[in-house]
Amino acid sequence: MKKFSELIIASGNENKVVHIKNFLEPFSLRIKSMSELNLEAPEENGSTYEENALIKAESIFSKCKMPVLADDSGFEIKSLHGFPGTVSARFASACGSYEEAFRILNSCISTDFRASFTTVIALIYEDDGQVVKKLFKGEIDGNFVYPGRGKNGFGYCPCFEPAGYNQTLSEMPDDVRMKFNHRAVALRKLCDFLKTLP
């Protein structure tokens, strides 16, 4: 397998695309986002992060036959059996806003505020005529806090305080948050893999 020179990021979320591009900068890849290529995201109907990431990656790969990277992320609250998890974005959308989602989640928690963020990255590419699929998982633990605090980041970042910190992800400077959040953990694993390609 030779190193590939191009990569499609199967996401329309510009915040996510910028984060991924920054991590992959040392590899000098020509990176395009799904929206730049006018491609539509498929419905994510998997029951796990792995399934959803693969659904996105496989759909875009089938259209372009180029290396594709996709991810699925979620916010899980332990005492709510991992909810909202794989439906994190849809739950917030159904609530009308992330702030309202935070309020509803807070009303459902009594004493156990432990929470976690998870990202799974799927990479699909062709090697000597064979389609190769790789998965890279990143997780960080912490606590749900309400009301949310901070202006940086997006999604559930304002209501998540990583273990060992007294700031939410949204209160942290971008350069700090981007180095250790759940997506960064998964991206470092991806980068380690890319370095092994001859």
Walk through the language-model features, giving the residues of each.
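Anionic-ligand binding patches
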Residues: 2-8, 15-198
